[in-house]
């Protein structure tokens, strides 16, 4: 299992507050039934969301779902 670092996620969304909010939004989507965009082995939704973000599967556009 590869470790996820904040630096990997900050390459995608440079603002750490926006990065946290984006990961939270995506984790909530996964927890209510959205299909993960990566292979996950019994990971928690927030871990899945952070891995997806580090792999550039989504970006700041997810924040538009809040507006």
Swiss-Prot record:
It catalyses: RNA(n) + a ribonucleoside 5'-triphosphate = RNA(n+1) + diphosphate. Signal peptide: none annotated. Promotes RNA polymerase assembly. Latches the N- and C-terminal regions of the beta' subunit thereby facilitating its interaction with the beta and alpha subunits. The keyword Nucleotide-binding does not apply. Keywords: DNA-directed RNA polymerase, Nucleotidyltransferase, Transcription, Transferase. InterPro entries: DNA-dir_RNA_pol_omega, Pol_omega/Rpo6/RPB6, RPB6/omega-like_sf. Pfam families: RNA_pol_Rpb6 (PF01192). GO terms for cellular component: DNA-directed RNA polymerase complex. One of its GO terms (molecular function) is DNA-directed RNA polymerase activity. HAMAP family: RNApol_bact_RpoZ. It comes from the Bacteria. This is DNA-directed RNA polymerase subunit omega. Belongs to the RNA polymerase subunit omega family.
